[in-house]
């Protein structure tokens, strides 16, 4: 039986089959066909990409809140916002089963050791989102009993501003965390030794959107938003 494979657009110059019926075959054509059928690269890059894809699309949050920002965080789990779209709807009651922790609310000095202990009980890889002005910098509580920013004792990956932030802001912070995880480079197993973790630099959204904000000329009143 003789047959020829054809593409959807057989008249395209680079999509004519079979190649053997052509009078001349350029090196570029052969190279294009090779790259379409053979992966040219490191298997390690493919493996890291697959692992990061699985990690960022299956983030299990630790069910833990401190203040009013926690109410806005839990609102993101309701149907209008549907955090399940990002694979982060599986709330865990134990830090050992969670992938990331959201510090949502005011962090008092008495609570800081407990938060740090809960963070240490989380298994690697783990991430932290600081949600709200109080968690970011102490907010309006510039007093001795409030920690002026949870990054003083925890490594924070994403800061979500607001007092309190809307659920949409929390979802944007979650998407930024997913973007950061997708670019991470960390050992695939602890067996190979401690090789450190590479995290890509994530510039502040305030700086990235500066030109966009300056370009706005028509400002609507609050009752029109």
Swiss-Prot record:
Q: Cross-referenced PROSITE patterns, in alphabetical order?
A: COMPLEX1_20K
Q: How does it associate, per the subunit comment?
A: NDH-1 is composed of 13 different subunits. Subunits NuoB, CD, E, F, and G constitute the peripheral sector of the complex.
A GO biological process held by the record: electron transport coupled proton transport
Q: What is its EC number?
A: 7.1.1.-
What does this chain do? NDH-1 shuttles electrons from NADH, via FMN and iron-sulfur (Fe-S) centers, to quinones in the respiratory chain. The immediate electron acceptor for the enzyme in this species is believed to be ubiquinone. Couples the redox reaction to proton translocation (for every two electrons transferred, four hydrogen ions are translocated across the cytoplasmic membrane), and thus conserves the redox energy in a proton gradient.
GO molecular function terms attached to this record:
4 iron, 4 sulfur cluster binding; iron ion binding; NADH dehydrogenase (ubiquinone) activity; NADH:ubiquinone reductase (non-electrogenic) activity; quinone binding
Record the organism.
Answer: Pseudomonas putida (strain GB-1)
- UniProt-recorded name of the protein: NADH-quinone oxidoreductase subunit B
- Supply the Pfam families for this chain: Oxidored_q6
Range of residues in the leader sequence: none
* Annotated family: Belongs to the complex I 20 kDa subunit family.
* A GO CC annotation given for this chain: plasma membrane
Q: Which reaction does it catalyse?
A: a quinone + NADH + 5 H(+)(in) = a quinol + NAD(+) + 4 H(+)(out)
Q: Which cofactor does it need?
A: [4Fe-4S] cluster
Keywords on record: 4Fe-4S, Cell inner membrane, Cell membrane, Iron, Iron-sulfur, Membrane, Metal-binding, NAD, Quinone, Translocase, Transport, Ubiquinone
Q: Could you tell me the membrane topology recorded for this protein?
A: Peripheral membrane protein
Q: Where in the cell is it found?
A: Cell inner membrane
Any binding details for the cofactor?
Binds 1 [4Fe-4S] cluster.
Database matches in PANTHER family: NADH DEHYDROGENASE (PTHR11995), NADH DEHYDROGENASE [UBIQUINONE] IRON-SULFUR PROTEIN 7, MITOCHONDRIAL (PTHR11995:SF14)
Family matches, as NCBIfam families: nuoB_fam (TIGR01957), PRK06411.1 (NF005012)
């Amino acid at each position: 039986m003789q047959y020829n494979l054809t593409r959807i657009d057989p008249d395209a110059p680079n999509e004519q089959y079979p190649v053997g019926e052509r009078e001349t075959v350029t090196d570029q054509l052969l190279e294009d066909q090779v790259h379409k059928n053979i992966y040219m690269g490191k298997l390690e890059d493919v493996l890291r990409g697959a692992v990061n894809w699985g990690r960022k699309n299956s983030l299990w949050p630790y069910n833990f809140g401190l203040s009013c920002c926690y109410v806005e965080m839990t609102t993101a789990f309701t149907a209008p916002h549907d955090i399940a779209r990002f694979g982060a709807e599986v709330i865990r009651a134990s830090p050992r089963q969670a992938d990331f922790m959201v510090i949502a609310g005011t962090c008092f000095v008495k609570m800081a050791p407990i938060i740090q202990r809960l963070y240490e009980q989380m298994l690697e890889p783990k991430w932290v989102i600081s949600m709200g002005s109080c968690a970011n910098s102490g907010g309006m509580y510039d007093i001795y009993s409030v920690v002026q920013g949870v990054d003083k004792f925890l490594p924070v990956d994403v800061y979500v501003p607001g007092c309190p932030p809307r659920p949409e802001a929390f979802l944007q912070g979650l998407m930024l965390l997913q973007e950061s995880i997708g670019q991470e480079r960390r050992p695939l197993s602890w067996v190979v030794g401690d090789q450190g973790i590479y995290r890509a630099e994530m510039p502040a959204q305030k700086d990235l959107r500066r030109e966009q904000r300056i370009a706005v000329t028509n400002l609507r009143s609050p009752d029109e938003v």
